Amino acid sequence: MNNPHKFDSNSLSKWMDSILAKEKWFVEPRYNVPKSTQDTISVGVLSPFCYDFSTIALGSLSIYHSINRDPNCPGIADRILVYDPITDENYNIFTNLKLEENLKTLERRIPLNKLDLICISLTGTDSITTILQILKLGGIPLLRSERQSGNYPLILAGGPGCINPEIFADFFDFFSMGDGCILSKKIVQAIHKLKIFDKKKKITGKDIFETIEDNSSLYVPELYNFTFKGEQITNIEPYKKINLIAQAVDPPIEYTQVSLFSNGQTAVIVPSRGCKNNCGYCLLTGQGYREADVKPLLEYVDKYIECGINSIVVNAASSTQYKEISILLDKLAEKIEKASFPIQVYLGSLCFDELTDEILKKIDRLKAFNHTYSLYTNGKLQKVMALAPEHGSLDILRGLGRKLNSWNILNSIDKAKKIGVYNFTLYLIVGFLSETAKDREQTAALASAIADKVYENNGKVTLKINPIIPTPGTACQRMGMPSVEDYKLYLKEIENGVKSRIGEERYKEQISIVSLPEERLLVESIIDRADRRISKIILKVLDYRSKGKSIDELELKKWVEESDFTWEHLTGQISLDAILPWQMINLINPKHEEKILTTLQNRINEEK
């Protein structure tokens, strides 16, 4: 385990050549349009995924295309991935990996440490160790302070995993809050301008902030001085008067809604972004709901079919909220039926309250019953519908601001049965403030009722049950979270509740419970709401994972005890008057936040 895994860089280069040769592009020219300047800025766009999945991750690809498709942007972007040859069968980077030379970009084979800018899209906080491993393999010092003395690239990070940028403040130079297409181009232009003025000058995040005219969505850690007293933040002093950081909203752009290229098999259309519902625990609530016009989406479907694409992903938080969903499904079906080869359609999430008989018939015509996550897993193709009732207790859900009645899902099950869908994946959450065993009994009762409805059809029900991990940027961001022991107890309670209703034998036949991996739960629970001092623990997590060592709760608690934090501070409830590490970007209405916490706290008082 401790022996270095040596890798032949020439083999990696040949693999890069082979996958680029297989790519199918739906726009010309490939990669980038001709640039109007000779002194182009070299950019790397880093995705924490292996190749196939990276081709449908439009978040990072939209940054890549925004730089490359604009003739007036003085930069050219290459992709940086978790290259398949440097990973094991589970797509984890080989332990103790040693390369003959620094890791390079996919297209132009530029060593990562020779780039001018690296843009990173983090889908979640747990992917930070993968990102840091890639940077390290590219010869880049991980700490921002260590890069000040050398000629290293600036690093811009964004995405849902950076909603609390302070946890990564010691690693990255600046953060894009909200959408990043327009801002990333402005940063490229600023670097270009500063380099022309003084080629030897060491450019900092502060320089970029002062050069960009509209910097309202750019968070630069070095511009904020934090004062700590023990584990608490007592003051945040900006470098100069800085308004609250706003969430950037890019205008509708083609490459945020469709794939401009494919791995030769799969392409994506994105009919909508965000969600219309206003649930206090969901990050999608704060992103704003946006829709794409149906016509250009369908035009790209034609291009996909013409190029022989056999998998099309319709990716949205809730496809059924899209106002033109009927037209989209009908036209998709018409085009696929005319194709000379079979095409599999994968749908994103469906809102059970919005499922009508008409929509289900259209989905049935498409045979689009497989959730997107099954595309690059070993998930067997079968009629499976993924729905998110979240919880069985209506009282809990009302307290969280969720207006949907989770028990209405039973009506959707009845409708789905009419078109032959008997297998369901249900997304559920446990561990909310004020939640009791009686509340979890309601979740068990709901799962049992669904199992009853599909039993005679040999239907299966998968319960994907996650603990509440209060997310910065949501109205539940100050809520405490359950311990690993409590989480396991809650899962057992739901399991026993279902068994008591349908019996042991039927439970074995029909029900499976999928939990969040323990290590991921532990890591996310302590870093998600921390401040920049958490970087020392992140580096320890990185060291363990790089060596292939698992992290248990005992080890993690030891690291926390040796830090400036306590376990209770990182995982417990945060008072309403406490200064949040992400205070400068906190856009949550304090009255809404207080209302949710007070409502749930009142439930506790009533129980007493």
What residues fall within each predicted segment?
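Radical SAM enzyme core and accessory elements
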Residues: 1-31, 39, 45, 501-608
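Acidic, glycine-rich segments characteristic of secretory precursors and extracytoplasmic regions
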Residues: 2-169, 174
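N-terminal [4Fe-4S]-dependent radical SAM core
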Residues: 11-42, 52, 221-271
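Conserved SAM/AdoMet-binding glycine-rich loop
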Residues: 45-52, 117, 302-425, 430-460
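Canonical Radical SAM [4Fe-4S] cluster-binding loop centered on the CxxxCxxC motif
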Residues: 57, 260-295
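Short secondary-structure boundary/capping segments
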Residues: 60-62, 135, 170-175, 191-192, ...
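Glycine-rich beta-alpha loop elements in corrinoid/cobalamin-binding modules
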Residues: 95-233, 472-531, 538-549, 593
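Segments forming glycine/polar-rich beta-alpha architectures that bind adenosine-containing cofactors
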Residues: 273, 303, 307-308, 341, ...
